[in-house]
């Protein structure tokens, strides 16, 4: 009996961190009708990647044209609009903020950065179209705006398009999300970063991970969406995972990770953690799947707009049902 009890204790102690990290048992919210429009998502991605390309820090005119496009969609959705200055030399750089629902009380924030990266290849400066990174996230944000116009949320919702996430601003006070997070006066229930939600690959071996052992828990095919948060964001990750699972045909995996796991803080949600705000990232896992990350091959034709629409449907389900 003692040996059995000891074995059970060892199994429990081994399994508990695994369950917390992986969260295998999350019940989906009831399914909802499909709302998001894949054609509109593609239209937004193509505008951002073709008409106003490149959207890098050294192309301020294109960034401002992108901001105006985003602002126009927010205005047409009936939101209360704020343009927030991001104090960077050579600007203006602006976050575009859209508020829906009650003007006071707790907020849910959904954010996505609209800038794109540049890089050097063979000592030559090149610009990525940034379809997945992060026109896909912005397209999701604007589709949420259109859907919030159709049904006003019962809780305060703030959609934020950030001007500066990519290098040289990443992990600095000049990130658009750092400026926004520091400016908040209302309590925040949850922040969600939409960071690369458009690239999917069902080929075996198409999904990589920071550590090889993670392939024991997660698929080797990159055909799922991921929800990522800190260990202390367990409830937030479960909430977002449950709402994404309400999109019936979307595979969803989650991770509550310790700080040293590479990639868990590679987007705008990291700045809300600095203010003790529950924040998660919805992502296709970026360069662990999309080999055109920050490269000229990150183009609109490589994205799956049906799956993007399913992600948006999951998020709007959360917003429609929040009180």
Cite the ranges covered by each PLM segment.
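N-terminal capping segment at the start of a domain
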Residues: 18-65, 77, 288-298
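Second-shell loop/turn segments in exported
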Residues: 29-36, 51-61, 82-87, 123-134, ...
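A non-catalytic alpha/beta surface segment that caps or lines the substrate-entry region
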Residues: 47-103, 253-255
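Solvent-exposed loop/turn segments at secondary-structure junctions
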Residues: 87-89, 102-104, 114-118, 164-168, ...
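Active-site-adjacent substrate-binding region
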Residues: 190, 202-323
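Extracytoplasmic/secreted proteins, especially bacterial periplasmic and envelope-associated proteins
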Residues: 40-43, 47, 61, 65-76, ...
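Acidic/histidine-rich catalytic neighborhood of metal-dependent amide-processing enzymes
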Residues: 128-232, 261-264
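Hydrophobic membrane-insertion alpha-helices, especially the h-region
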Residues: 5-21
């Amino acid at each position: 009996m003692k040996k059995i009890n000891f074995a059970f204790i060892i199994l429990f102690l081994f399994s508990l961190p695994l369950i917390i990290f992986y969260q295998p048992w999350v019940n989906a919210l009831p399914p909802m009708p499909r709302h998001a429009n894949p054609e509109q998502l593609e239209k937004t991605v193509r505008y951002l990647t073709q008409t106003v390309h490149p959207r890098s820090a050294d192309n301020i005119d294109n960034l401002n044209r992108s901001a105006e496009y985003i602002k126009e969609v927010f205005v047409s959705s009936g939101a209360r609009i704020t343009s927030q200055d991001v104090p960077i030399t050579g600007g203006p750089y602006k976050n575009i903020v859209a508020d829906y629902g009650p003007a006071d009380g707790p907020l849910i924030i959904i954010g996505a950065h609209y800038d794109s990266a540049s890089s050097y290849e063979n000592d030559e400066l090149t610009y990525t179209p940034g379809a997945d990174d992060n026109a896909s996230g912005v397209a999701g944000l604007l589709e949420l705006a259109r859907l919030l116009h159709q049904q006003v949320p019962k809780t305060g919702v703030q959609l934020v398009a950030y001007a500066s996430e990519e290098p040289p601003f990443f992990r600095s006070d000049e990130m658009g999300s750092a400026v926004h997070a520091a400016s908040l006066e209302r309590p925040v229930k949850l922040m969600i970063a939409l960071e690369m939600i458009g690239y999917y690959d069902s080929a075996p071996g198409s999904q990589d991970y920071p550590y090889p052992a993670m392939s024991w828990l997660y698929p080797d095919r990159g055909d799922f969406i991921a929800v990522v948060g800190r260990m202390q964001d367990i409830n937030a990750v479960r909430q977002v995972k449950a709402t994404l699972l309400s999109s019936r045909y979307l595979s969803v995996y989650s991770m509550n990770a310790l700080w040293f796991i590479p990639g868990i803080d590679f987007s705008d949600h990291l700045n809300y953690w600095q203010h003790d705000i529950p924040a998660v990232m919805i992502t296709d896992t970026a360069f662990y799947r999309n080999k055109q990350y920050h490269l000229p091959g990150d183009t609109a034709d490589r994205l799956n707009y049906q799956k993007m629409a399913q992600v948006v449907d999951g998020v709007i389900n959360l917003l429609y049902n929040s009180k």
